[in-house]
Regions:
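Aromatic/hydrophobic pocket-lining residues that form the small-molecule binding cavity
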Residues: 6, 39, 43, 73, ...
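Active-site glycine- and acidic-residue-rich loops that bind
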Residues: 1-4, 131-137
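Glycine-rich, proline-tolerant flexible connector loops at the mouths of alpha/beta enzymes
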Residues: 22-43, 60-69
Length: 137
C-alpha cells in the first residue's frame, strides 16, 4: 500500500508494483495539509487507473467530522462509491455509518487508536478492515 497525493506519485506507485494506494481529497483527511493535489473530480480517474493495474484504491476520510462537515462528507463518500473506489478509510463514526448505509466498504484508520480486544470487537461491527494502533507490535 502506497500513499499518493498526485498523478506523479500514483504513477510511481504503479511502477513500483504497489497493490493498493491511499489518498485524500478536499479537507476531510489527515493528509490534506501535506500531500494532496486530488479533488472529488479525480475519483473516477483514480479508480479507473487502479482497476486497470489490478490495484485497490482507498480514500482517506479520517478526521473528526463536525456538524458543518456532514454534507461535504456525504458528498465525498457517495462520490467515492459511485466512482468505484475500493473503500474509505474512516476514523469518525459518522463516516463509518454513512459509508455502510450506501454499501461502501469501510476500513478503520489507525487514527482510532484501537489497542484492546474490546475496542476491536466494537469497531469490527462497523468495518470490513480494522487497522490497529501504531503503538502495538
Amino acid at each position: 500500500m502506497a500513499p499518493v497525493g498526485s498523478r506523479e506519485s500514483l504513477a510511481a506507485a504503479i511502477q513500483a508494483g504497489a497493490d493498493s494506494i491511499y489518498f485524500g481529497i478536499e479537507n476531510l483527511n489527515m493528509r490534506s495539509r501535506s500531500a494532496s493535489a486530488f479533488t472529488i473530480d479525480d475519483l473516477r480517474e483514480i479508480a479507473g487507473v487502479c482497476n486497470d493495474h489490478g490495484m485497490k484504491s482507498y480514500l482517506t476520510v479520517n478526521v473528526i467530522i463536525y456538524d458543518n462537515d456532514m454534507e461535504q462528507m456525504r458528498t465525498i463518500v457517495r462520490a467515492a462509491k459511485e466512482a468505484g473506489i475500493s473503500a474509505v478509510i474512516a476514523s469518525d463514526v459518522s463516516v463509518m455509518n454513512f459509508a455502510r448505509s450506501i454499501g461502501q466498504e469501510v476500513h478503520l484508520s489507525t487514527q482510532l487508536n484501537i489497542t484492546n480486544i474490546e475496542s476491536l470487537k466494537f469497531y469490527a461491527l462497523f468495518a470490513d478492515v480494522v487497522v490497529l494502533a501504531r503503538e502495538l507490535n
